Amino acid sequence: MVEITAAELEAAEKIFGERLDLAKRYVEHLATSGTERGLIGPREIPRLWSRHVLNCAVIESAIAMDSHVADVGSGAGLPGLCLAIARPDLELTLIEPLERRVIWLQEVVDDLGLDNVTIMRTRAELAVGMVDADVVTARAVSALSNLAGLTIPLLNGHGEVVAIKGRSAAEEIEKAKKVIRKLGGVETSVVVCGQELLEEPTTVVRIIVNKPGKTA
């Protein structure tokens, strides 16, 4: 069983509430079959809670109630499955092109009984028109200048992109601002999530999209 510190447990209890047991089971999947199948590196096991699950789950505070969220490049379900567990009000579509990852994701979803998750085996650019998302999330997919083109079109002209980034967030925004504006991004900002819960809060880039000619 993956160890969890007192501080991590306190944060997890606040984020996941009565669904904490589901989060613990998800972490065990990451530590066992997730590692065996190459979705998570073995060295990450001791920090699955802090660096991965909690780091992702805290972005739920940036997502409105009852949103349909498309998670691009879901991989091991970070942040998609974290959000599905923390927020049963959300409808999640996990977009992942690699078959072995899709198979693993489906096994975990089935085991946890997550009825608010759909998994699509495809590339983000091919999913345009197939997903009607209010919010698009991503973590460790690519630089923002490229990521904008993979995420914004999934919003059908309006909504938000919430991308987990690191210390280079502001620099990435500067480099991507022309692309973002061209795609319909009207406001881009850096948001810090989990300041009161985590020792190292999560930095996200938030893009509000409202493309001319499109209505909510």
Swiss-Prot record:
Family statement drawn from the similarity comment of this UniProt entry: Belongs to the methyltransferase superfamily. RNA methyltransferase RsmG family.
Residues the record lists as binding S-adenosyl-L-methionine: G73, L78, A124, E125, R139
GO cellular component, one term: cytosol
E.C. no: 2.1.1.-
Chain's role: Specifically methylates the N7 position of guanine in position 518 of 16S rRNA.
NCBIfam families: rsmG_gidB
Localisation per UniProt entry: Cytoplasm
Xref: SUPFAM superfamilies: S-adenosyl-L-methionine-dependent methyltransferases (SSF53335)
One Pfam family per UniProt: GidB
InterPro entries: rRNA_ssu_MeTfrase_G, SAM-dependent_MTases_sf
Recorded GO MF terms: rRNA (guanine-N7-)-methyltransferase activity
Protein name as catalogued: Ribosomal RNA small subunit methyltransferase G
Keywords associated with the record: Cytoplasm, Methyltransferase, rRNA processing, S-adenosyl-L-methionine, Transferase
Gene this chain is encoded by: rsmG
